[in-house]
Swiss-Prot record:
Lineage start: Bacteria, Pseudomonadati, Pseudomonadota, Gammaproteobacteria, Pseudomonadales
Pfam families in the cross-refs: Ribosomal_L14 (PF00238)
Function, as annotated: Binds to 23S rRNA. Forms part of two intersubunit bridges in the 70S ribosome.
Disulphide connectivity of cysteines: none
InterPro entries: Ribosomal_uL14, Ribosomal_uL14_bac-type, Ribosomal_uL14_CS, Ribosomal_uL14_sf
Example of a GO cellular component annotation carried by this entry: cytosolic large ribosomal subunit
UniProtKB keywords: Ribonucleoprotein, Ribosomal protein, RNA-binding, rRNA-binding
GO biological process: translation
Superkingdom of origin organism: Bacteria
Complex formation: Part of the 50S ribosomal subunit. Forms a cluster with proteins L3 and L19. In the 70S ribosome, L14 and L19 interact and together make contacts with the 16S rRNA in bridges B5 and B8.
Protein name: Large ribosomal subunit protein uL14
Amino acid sequence: MIQTQTMLEVADNSGARQVMCIKVLGGSHRRYATVGDIIKVTVKEAIPRGKVKKGQVLKAVVVRTRKGVRRPDGSLIRFDGNAAVLLNNQDAPIGTRIFGPVTRELRNEKFMKIISLAPEVL
């Protein structure tokens, strides 16, 4: 469950290390985002010579949450931290590699690129 002011790790090689959620997209008073939701983020920490700079405002898709994802069979997939993958204005990933596992809930036509780049799909 990601809300405004939540800090997230970045799970790609775009150059950002940490981002902060500034808005949950999809509805005028939407409070929380979960795995597969698009959020607006600002870069809080970045590496030198990366594709993104500190202070930049971008879109991101949430790929891992501490809260977890409940599956229809009753199982819960939970992670150690919150992570996101940065997106450009066309909702395509900025980075060319994805680090760490992602969940099967991302498997729709919008995020198949992230699924194919991920080392592990849970």
